[in-house]
Amino acid sequence: MLKTLRILVISFLILLPNTILYAEEINKPGVASAHPLATKVGYEILAQGGNAFDAAVAISATLSVVEPYSSGLGGGGFFLLHDSSSMEDVFVDAREKAPSNANRDMYLDNDGNVMRSASLDGPLASGIPGLPAALHHVSLDYGTMPLYKLLQPAIRLARDGFPAYERLITALLVAEKSRTLSPKFKEIFMPDGKPPVVGQIVRQPELAKTLEVLASSGHTGFYDSFFTQKMVEESNQDGSIWHLDDFKSYAVTERAPINISFLGAKLTMAPPPSSGGTTIATILNIISQFDFMGMDSAKRAHLITESMRRAYRDRAFNLGDPDFVDVPIDKLISMEHAKELAQSINLDQATPIHEDDDIDGKFALNEGAHTSHFSVLDKNGNRAAVTQTINTWFGSGYMLPSSGMILNNEMDDFSAKPFTPNRYGLVHGEQNSIEPNKRMLSSMTPTFIESDRGVAILGTPGGSRIITMVLLSIIDYFNGGDAQSMTASKRFHHQFLPDVIRHEKDAFTNDVKEDLQIKGHNLQEISNYGNMQVVTFDNATGETESSSDPRGLIEGFEIDFY
């Protein structure tokens, strides 16, 4: 039975305006994910009477099976949830943790240089997984259906298989040439010594059994059982430093989201250990100091770039796990701080790198197609924005033999050595150094927008570029964009170091590129990136629109979603 969504005037934080949402009812739910099979599962759960949180659990588990290069039970994620009955938002932090045996210099050689492959390949690169804990927690605390039922679609797809598709095959070809892949990984995904062909059925029987353990025994079955002991033994035999107590002590953490006001709307975003919310808040606060909406395209691009530069510098020097370090969130997202940063921007010239910022190192900014995001809105107005990951394509490249889980390589998201760039060219300071049981900094940025127009639920994969992709989609929304334009619009990125604007083809006109270069910007055209997933709801019409990024569309699945 449809329930009418009537949202009264709510007073948020003092810094936020009162926002009135006046929809009569939500005519249909919305689901957007990176794989058609996961989207189908989400709609099926909603059709069975489940809420957005039930659907989120089922979608998350399904993506762990059918999109194994992006996320999985061997990784972690962030769940941004909105409960329409209580009007409360919560951020469920299921980020991986460093093992208790981890130490600050574990990826340095005898000369103090970073051994990059050690934090990328094999089980030594793996943090303690958090996604299974999140599935149990979200289902138990926010869902209406039993976890056992929610995991059945993923179990079937792992056991019975799904057709291989171009994106999976491409990821396997790249991994085969560039990564060290474990024997069990090759057995599952390259049974004939090579990747499957399109349409060939991919089965993961051990992963199906792992999902069954989680479905029947929940958190305890995964984190404190004979199953856990077997995982630890296998990974340690191949080089990890896991301890059984690392799993027994793992728990998700609920945190207050980052909330800011922008152009009269409320933005709800991910807090640390995500760097997304604070970084986007800083950028939007900076550009709000100018007549941003009245600028021409060239001035806008320059201002956004200069704001990105400053916000990413803040990220490098200030952010880390808030349970371990003092993160000055209130200062970073304050208007006073934004005004100070805005005053340092010259609208006619790019900011040269200060000599203190010219940190030694090669800043290889790798392509960002990793990680996965999905967005859900149910008919009662509950919503979920979920980003989950194992870091790079296929994580560490190591699959646990008995459980069929691909382990993450999230330890590379720590600062192995302060201000030495990681896989994504990002630099971090002491705040993000390795410590036992610490969560590594992340760029994942699940986001809600609430305005007088309605609601938008969004997020994307893309490594260090996640933040700027979400930022540009937010700006597109305020320019009148819809779900399709938010996923399809062209992108550009600056992350403080390296000092270059990386942009998709046609992100700028020739005139804008010339203007930016005259101002002193370095430009580099790159291939398309990201896989934005957006659901919007229009207050005036009650209509829902779901859109998946055309850059990541998976073909070959004829599915009627709704």
Predicted regions located by residue number:
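Extended C-terminal subregions enriched in glycine
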Residues: 438, 470-471, 479-527
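Short, small/polar residue-rich loop motifs at catalytic or cofactor-binding pockets
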Residues: 254, 368-371, 393, 442-444
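Internal maturation/activation junctions in enzymes
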Residues: 290-389, 402-403, 418-419
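M16/insulysin-pitrilysin zinc metalloprotease superfamily fold
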Residues: 277-292, 449-456, 463-487
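Bacterial N-terminal signal peptides
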Residues: 8-18
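Noncatalytic scaffold domains of N-terminal-nucleophile
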Residues: 24-40, 44, 52-224, 228-271, ...
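Active-site rim segments in enzyme catalytic domains, especially the processed small/beta chain
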Residues: 65-82, 86-91, 241-243, 383-451, ...
